[in-house]
A protein has these predicted regions:
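Generic N-terminal targeting/processing segments that precede catalytic cores or assembly contacts
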Residues: 1-390
């Protein structure tokens, strides 16, 4: 069973990504993992933290001579900002540590600060902030890059693009080739396939910046080349659409998830929603005239592109803070301010790619198994022959 967990705090020594259940023999491209981490740091509206961190992946277990070895994989990502926080967040209770602390007692509305402090009985939300921070997503992207490398062995690709920032929206569907092109362009400010729509999105970010505010939006993740038959209708927790929704919903600031055109489908008639089926003789596969289901029916992949959208609220930290209550004095105060971003939608899309890739890789290995890449490939090839003969 493929499993991913992470460890580390925003201003701690490092972040750790730990992946188990990965087959042996998968080629590991460090430059690709590095590029994925770099993509997460990009985007119009990101904050100063991105100029500090370099996010170099340091694989410390599970890979030898450029290939996975079937053991758990551990990736370490150094926090360069730790140098500025070492005295405030020491591991040991050293003399003078109290004087160096940077307490946070004015919880930010919308953040985990107060809920986490109540849960763990902290009267300082610093420890909650440190783990709840979206800095943690660097470990997700590192793990997701490994999942992408596995999926690529079977000609499957997962990418994302921005379809909305604030009130500005891409008012058309994007072709896969357009998404490929914009993802290759690391200079694209918001990773939107349409220049006119992107200019309007930038204006939304500029407005929020001038107002001391933040702005949310929507990213769309597309998984291309995924074979039919992943997931299952047989049990509620085996439905792949449910698993993908949970994976994307777990991303910081994501407050809603959509599969296919699920939102508009809810206000349409059945005859307008269902994707008609046809048989494509040259490819020996069943195909659809549309993809409103987003590549999933009954919790199972149907061979179409998988389409998942994540809806991001504006981040909680504001340069013009809202009202809060001090956790110690109980007095009305302005919420705390921490260095932050104005817009994280493009970065959210990269994290969305990672989470979708991890869930798809897990479902892929559940379907095809294999302790080594060679064994997984034999099983996959056998399934392809079965589909050809169907």
């Amino acid at each position: 069973m493929l499993r991913f967990v992470s460890a580390g705090e925003s201003h701690g020594q490092a972040l750790i990504a730990w992946v188990s259940g990965f087959p042996a023999g998968v080629p590991v491209d460090l430059e690709f993992i590095q590029r994925e981490l770099h993509r997460r740091q990009l985007g119009y509206g990101r904050g100063a933290r991105q100029r500090i961190e370099k996010d170099q992946p340091d694989i410390i277990a599970g890979v030898r001579h450029g290939h996975t070895i079937g053991a758990p994989i551990a990736v370490r990502i150094e926090n360069r900002d730790w140098a500025n926080w070492e005295k405030a967040l020491p591991v040991e209770d050293t003399e003078g540590a109290d004087d160096a602390q940077r307490p946070l007692t004015a919880p930010r509305p919308g953040h985990a600060d107060l809920a986490g402090a109540l849960k763990f009985n902290f009267h300082d939300a610093r420890y909650v902030l440190e783990r709840a921070s979206a800095r943690e997503t660097a470990s997700r992207v590192a793990a997701g890059a490994l999942a992408k490398l596995l999926l690529r062995e079977f000609a499957a690709e997962v990418l994302s693009h921005t379809i909305a920032v604030g009130h500005a929206r891409l008012e058309r569907d994007a072709a896969w080739e357009e998404i490929e092109t914009v993802c290759k362009n690391l200079e694209s400010p918001l990773r939107c396939v349409d220049g006119t729509a992107e200019a309007k999105m930038k204006a939304e970010v500029d407005h929020a910046l001038r107002a001391g505010d933040s702005v949310g939006g929507v990213f769309e993740v597309i998984a291309h080349g995924i074979p039919p038959g992943l997931g299952s209708h047989a049990q509620w927790d085996e439905k792949l659409d449910a698993r993908l929704a949970r994976a994307v919903m777990s991303i910081q600031a994501v407050k809603a998830v959509e599969l296919g055109s699920g939102v508009s489908n809810s206000s349409s008639y059945g005859s307008e929603v269902q994707d008609e089926i046809r048989y494509d003789a040259p490819s020996k596969r069943f195909a659809r005239s549309s993809n409103r289901a987003g590549g999933l029916e009954g919790g199972i992949t149907n061979g179409q592109d998988i389409v998942v959208r994540g809806y991001l609220k504006p981040i909680s930290t504001l340069r013009r803070p809202l009202l809060s209550a001090d956790m110690k004095t109980k007095e009305a105060v302005k919420a705390a301010y921490e260095r932050s971003d104005v817009c994280v939608v493009p970065a959210g899309g990269v994290v969305g790619e990672a989470m979708v890739s991890l869930e798809l890789a897990a479902a892929f290995l559940e379907k095809f198994g294999g302790d080594s890449l060679a064994e997984t490939r034999r099983n996959f090839d056998g399934n392809q022959k079965q589909l050809d003969a169907f």
